[in-house]
C-alpha cells in the first residue's frame, strides 16, 4: 500500500483537481494547491510544466504508483504497436487494482491495492495478492466468499459516486468482474481530463 494512503486527498490539491471525483475530497472546499499563498498562484505554466503535471496526475490517479513502476509502464506502452498514449491507458486500466476499483468492489484505488494485498481477491479461480498484476481480456476477478460482507465492500457497492465502465462486466451476486477488453482513453470514466499524450511527450522529450 502506498505510504501516501493517509493523505491521498492532499494529492487533489497538489495537482489542482479532484481527480477521483469524490465528495470527501478537501479540494471541494479549498480548490487551490497547498501552501499559504496557493490560492494566489497564477503563474504561466511552461510546456514542460504541463507535461509534468499530466504525468503526476495520471500516476496519482492509479494509487500514486512509484515513479519507477510508472516509467516502466510507459516504456512498455512505447514499444507496443499503435498510439503510445492509448497504449499507456490500456496498460494502466488492465492492472488488477484498477479493475477491482472499476468493479466497485472497493471505494478507492488505494483500498483496492490493500484489499488485494490482504488476499481477498481471486483471478480465474486462484488467489492473487499483486495489485499491479496485468489482466487479459476474458480474465475473471472474484472477491473471496469470506470477504464479501466486509464494510468497505458494501460501502463501495452502494456508492452512487461511480459507474461501472462497459469494459468491465460485473455480476454483483457472484461478486465477479470480467475484464472484457482493453479500453481506449475515451472509454475510461475519469472524473477529470487526463492527457496521456502529454505524458508521452514528457518521457520522450
Swiss-Prot record:
Entry-linked Pfam families: Ribosomal_S4, S4
PROSITE patterns cross-referenced by the UniProt entry: RIBOSOMAL_S4, S4
Top-level lineage group: Bacteria
Oligomeric and partner information: Part of the 30S ribosomal subunit. Contacts protein S5. The interaction surface between S4 and S5 is involved in control of translational fidelity.
GO molecular function per UniProt: rRNA binding; structural constituent of ribosome
Its biological purpose: One of the primary rRNA binding proteins, it binds directly to 16S rRNA where it nucleates assembly of the body of the 30S subunit.
Family stated for the protein in its record: Belongs to the universal ribosomal protein uS4 family.
Entry protein name: Small ribosomal subunit protein uS4
Keyword Hydrolase among record annotations: no
Gene Ontology cellular component annotations, sorted alphabetically: small ribosomal subunit
Entry keyword annotation includes Acyltransferase: no
Organism: Hyphomonas neptunium (strain ATCC 15444)
Amino acid at each position: 500500500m502506498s505510504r501516501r494512503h493517509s493523505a491521498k486527498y492532499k494529492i487533489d490539491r497538489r495537482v489542482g483537481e479532484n481527480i477521483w471525483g469524490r465528495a470527501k475530497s478537501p479540494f471541494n472546499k479549498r480548490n487551490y494547491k497547498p501552501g499559504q499563498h496557493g490560492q494566489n498562484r497564477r503563474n504561466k505554466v511552461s510546456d514542460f510544466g504541463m507535461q509534468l503535471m499530466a504525468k503526476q496526475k495520471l500516476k496519482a490517479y492509479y494509487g500514486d504508483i512509484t515513479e519507477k513502476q510508472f516509467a516502466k509502464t510507459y516504456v512498455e506502452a512505447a514499444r507496443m504497436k499503435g498510439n503510445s498514449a492509448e497504449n499507456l491507458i490500456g496498460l494502466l486500466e488492465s492492472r488488477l487494482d484498477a479493475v477491482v476499483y472499476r468493479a466497485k468492489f472497493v471505494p478507492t484505488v488505494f483500498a483496492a491495492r490493500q484489499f488485494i494485498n490482504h488476499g481477498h481477491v481471486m483471478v480465474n479461480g486462484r488467489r492473487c495478492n499483486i495489485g499491479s498484476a496485468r489482466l487479459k481480456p476474458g480474465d475473471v476477478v472474484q472477491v473471496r466468499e469470506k470477504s464479501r460482507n466486509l464494510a468497505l465492500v458494501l460501502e463501495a457497492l452502494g456508492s452512487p459516486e461511480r459507474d461501472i465502465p462497459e469494459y468491465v462486466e460485473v455480476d454483483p451476486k457472484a461478486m465477479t468482474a470480467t475484464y472484457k477488453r482493453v479500453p481506449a482513453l475515451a472509454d475510461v470514466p475519469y472524473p477529470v481530463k487526463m492527457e496521456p499524450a502529454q505524458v508521452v511527450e514528457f518521457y520522450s522529450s
